[in-house]
Amino acid sequence: MNETQIQRETRQVVEDVLEKTNLKQGALFVLGLSSSEVLGGHIGKESSQEIGELIVETILDILGSRGIHLAVQGCEHVNRALVVERQVAEQFGLEIVSVHPTLHAGGSGQLAAFKFMQDPVEVEFIKAHAGLDIGDTAIGMHVKHVQVPIRPILREIGHAHVTALASRPKLIGGARAHYPQDAIRKT
Protein backbone atom coordinates (compact mmCIF):
# COMPACT_ATOMS: atom_id res chain seq x y z
CA MET A 1 0.00 0.00 0.00
CA ASN A 2 1.38 3.39 -1.05
CA GLU A 3 1.71 5.71 1.97
CA THR A 4 1.56 8.82 -0.21
CA GLN A 5 -1.77 7.64 -1.62
CA ILE A 6 -3.16 6.90 1.86
CA GLN A 7 -2.12 10.35 3.07
CA ARG A 8 -3.64 12.01 -0.01
CA GLU A 9 -6.92 10.08 0.37
CA THR A 10 -7.07 10.91 4.09
CA ARG A 11 -6.54 14.60 3.39
CA GLN A 12 -9.21 14.60 0.64
CA VAL A 13 -11.79 12.88 2.82
CA VAL A 14 -11.18 14.97 5.95
CA GLU A 15 -11.26 18.27 4.07
CA ASP A 16 -14.44 17.19 2.28
CA VAL A 17 -16.14 16.14 5.54
CA LEU A 18 -15.14 19.41 7.21
CA GLU A 19 -16.59 21.37 4.31
CA LYS A 20 -19.84 19.40 4.38
CA THR A 21 -20.25 19.60 8.16
CA ASN A 22 -19.21 23.26 8.48
CA LEU A 23 -17.51 22.58 11.83
CA LYS A 24 -16.47 25.65 13.77
CA GLN A 25 -13.34 26.34 15.78
CA GLY A 26 -13.52 24.55 19.13
CA ALA A 27 -15.62 21.64 17.82
CA LEU A 28 -14.89 18.00 18.69
CA PHE A 29 -14.16 15.56 15.85
CA VAL A 30 -14.00 11.82 16.55
CA LEU A 31 -11.88 9.41 14.52
CA GLY A 32 -12.40 5.68 14.39
CA LEU A 33 -9.55 3.94 12.56
CA SER A 34 -8.72 0.38 11.60
CA SER A 35 -5.24 0.34 10.08
CA SER A 36 -5.83 -3.36 9.37
CA GLU A 37 -8.75 -2.47 7.09
CA VAL A 38 -6.74 0.30 5.39
CA LEU A 39 -4.17 -2.35 4.45
CA GLY A 40 -6.86 -4.76 3.22
CA GLY A 41 -6.96 -6.99 6.29
CA HIS A 42 -9.62 -7.80 8.86
CA ILE A 43 -10.28 -5.21 11.58
CA GLY A 44 -8.01 -5.74 14.59
CA LYS A 45 -5.96 -8.51 13.00
CA GLU A 46 -3.18 -6.76 11.07
CA SER A 47 -2.70 -3.44 12.87
CA SER A 48 0.02 -1.15 11.51
CA GLN A 49 1.62 1.49 13.70
CA GLU A 50 3.01 3.23 10.60
CA ILE A 51 -0.41 3.58 8.98
CA GLY A 52 -1.96 4.75 12.26
CA GLU A 53 0.71 7.42 12.61
CA LEU A 54 0.39 8.53 8.99
CA ILE A 55 -3.39 8.98 9.22
CA VAL A 56 -3.53 10.54 12.70
CA GLU A 57 -0.69 12.97 11.99
CA THR A 58 -2.40 14.04 8.75
CA ILE A 59 -5.74 14.58 10.48
CA LEU A 60 -4.17 16.43 13.43
CA ASP A 61 -2.50 18.79 10.96
CA ILE A 62 -5.77 19.54 9.16
CA LEU A 63 -7.88 19.92 12.30
CA GLY A 64 -5.23 21.86 14.20
CA SER A 65 -5.06 24.53 11.51
CA ARG A 66 -8.81 25.06 12.00
CA GLY A 67 -8.86 24.92 15.80
CA ILE A 68 -10.90 21.70 15.82
CA HIS A 69 -10.15 19.10 18.53
CA LEU A 70 -9.46 15.45 17.65
CA ALA A 71 -10.66 12.49 19.72
CA VAL A 72 -9.33 9.09 18.64
CA GLN A 73 -11.60 6.17 19.49
CA GLY A 74 -10.08 2.90 20.63
CA CYS A 75 -11.39 -0.59 20.01
CA GLU A 76 -13.72 -2.63 22.19
CA HIS A 77 -10.75 -3.91 24.23
CA VAL A 78 -10.60 -0.46 25.86
CA ASN A 79 -14.40 -0.04 25.81
CA ARG A 80 -14.09 2.40 22.90
CA ALA A 81 -12.46 4.99 25.15
CA LEU A 82 -10.98 7.99 23.36
CA VAL A 83 -7.65 9.81 23.37
CA VAL A 84 -7.92 13.60 23.63
CA GLU A 85 -5.69 16.40 24.83
CA ARG A 86 -5.91 16.91 28.60
CA GLN A 87 -6.98 20.52 27.98
CA VAL A 88 -9.92 19.25 25.88
CA ALA A 89 -10.95 16.81 28.63
CA GLU A 90 -10.90 19.63 31.16
CA GLN A 91 -12.65 22.14 28.88
CA PHE A 92 -15.52 19.76 28.09
CA GLY A 93 -15.73 18.19 31.57
CA LEU A 94 -14.80 14.72 30.31
CA GLU A 95 -13.97 11.99 32.80
CA ILE A 96 -10.40 10.78 32.44
CA VAL A 97 -9.92 7.00 32.73
CA SER A 98 -6.80 4.93 33.38
CA VAL A 99 -5.66 2.94 30.38
CA HIS A 100 -2.71 3.17 28.03
CA PRO A 101 -3.32 1.85 24.51
CA THR A 102 -1.34 -0.89 22.83
CA LEU A 103 -1.37 -1.95 19.21
CA HIS A 104 -4.00 -4.62 19.92
CA ALA A 105 -5.92 -2.88 22.73
CA GLY A 106 -6.78 0.64 21.67
CA GLY A 107 -5.08 0.36 18.33
CA SER A 108 -2.63 2.14 16.08
CA GLY A 109 -4.67 5.34 15.95
CA GLN A 110 -4.63 5.70 19.72
CA LEU A 111 -0.91 4.97 19.90
CA ALA A 112 -0.35 7.64 17.25
CA ALA A 113 -2.47 10.11 19.21
CA PHE A 114 -0.34 9.45 22.29
CA LYS A 115 2.75 10.10 20.16
CA PHE A 116 1.62 13.31 18.45
CA MET A 117 -0.63 15.02 21.02
CA GLN A 118 1.00 17.32 23.58
CA ASP A 119 -0.67 15.95 26.74
CA PRO A 120 -2.88 12.99 25.77
CA VAL A 121 -5.33 11.33 28.13
CA GLU A 122 -8.04 8.71 27.72
CA VAL A 123 -11.68 9.56 28.37
CA GLU A 124 -14.63 7.19 28.51
CA PHE A 125 -17.24 9.13 26.53
CA ILE A 126 -17.60 12.24 24.41
CA LYS A 127 -20.32 13.88 22.36
CA ALA A 128 -18.47 14.99 19.24
CA HIS A 129 -19.94 17.38 16.71
CA ALA A 130 -18.85 15.15 13.81
CA GLY A 131 -16.59 12.25 13.01
CA LEU A 132 -14.90 10.01 10.50
CA ASP A 133 -14.97 6.21 10.53
CA ILE A 134 -12.16 4.54 8.59
CA GLY A 135 -12.73 0.78 8.48
CA ASP A 136 -16.19 0.32 10.02
CA THR A 137 -15.17 0.95 13.64
CA ALA A 138 -18.62 2.21 14.77
CA ILE A 139 -18.17 5.82 15.97
CA GLY A 140 -21.89 6.60 16.35
CA MET A 141 -21.90 6.23 20.13
CA HIS A 142 -19.56 9.23 20.36
CA VAL A 143 -21.40 11.69 18.07
CA LYS A 144 -24.07 14.05 19.42
CA HIS A 145 -27.73 13.58 18.64
CA VAL A 146 -29.07 14.05 16.04
CA GLN A 147 -26.53 12.23 13.89
CA VAL A 148 -26.64 12.83 10.16
CA PRO A 149 -24.75 10.56 7.73
CA ILE A 150 -22.29 12.38 5.50
CA ARG A 151 -21.19 10.80 2.24
CA PRO A 152 -17.45 11.50 1.86
CA ILE A 153 -15.92 12.31 -1.51
CA LEU A 154 -14.17 8.91 -1.44
CA ARG A 155 -15.72 5.67 -0.21
CA GLU A 156 -12.38 4.15 0.79
CA ILE A 157 -9.03 5.12 2.25
CA GLY A 158 -6.67 2.41 1.13
CA HIS A 159 -8.90 -0.65 1.31
CA ALA A 160 -10.98 0.58 4.27
CA HIS A 161 -14.62 1.54 3.90
CA VAL A 162 -15.13 5.17 4.97
CA THR A 163 -18.23 6.78 6.49
CA ALA A 164 -18.78 10.05 8.31
CA LEU A 165 -21.30 11.59 10.68
CA ALA A 166 -22.31 15.14 11.42
CA SER A 167 -24.78 16.31 14.02
CA ARG A 168 -27.54 18.85 14.17
CA PRO A 169 -29.78 20.16 16.95
CA LYS A 170 -32.98 18.23 17.64
CA LEU A 171 -36.10 19.66 16.04
CA ILE A 172 -38.67 20.24 18.77
CA GLY A 173 -42.02 21.98 19.00
CA GLY A 174 -44.43 20.21 16.70
CA ALA A 175 -46.51 21.30 13.71
CA ARG A 176 -46.60 25.03 14.49
CA ALA A 177 -42.87 25.39 15.07
CA HIS A 178 -40.50 26.88 12.53
CA TYR A 179 -36.91 25.77 12.18
CA PRO A 180 -33.86 27.67 10.97
CA GLN A 181 -32.15 26.42 7.84
CA ASP A 182 -28.93 24.53 8.36
CA ALA A 183 -26.58 22.89 5.92
CA ILE A 184 -26.73 19.50 7.65
CA ARG A 185 -30.48 18.92 7.85
CA LYS A 186 -31.88 17.13 4.85
CA THR A 187 -35.04 18.69 3.46
Swiss-Prot record:
It comes from the Bacteria. Transmembrane segments: none annotated. Pfam families: DUF436. Gene3D superfamilies: Hypothetical protein TT1679. Belongs to the UPF0340 family. NCBIfam families: TIGR01440 family protein. This is UPF0340 protein SPN23F05980. It comes from Streptococcus pneumoniae (strain ATCC 700669 / Spain 23F-1). The lineage of its organism: Bacteria, Bacillati, Bacillota, Bacilli, Lactobacillales.
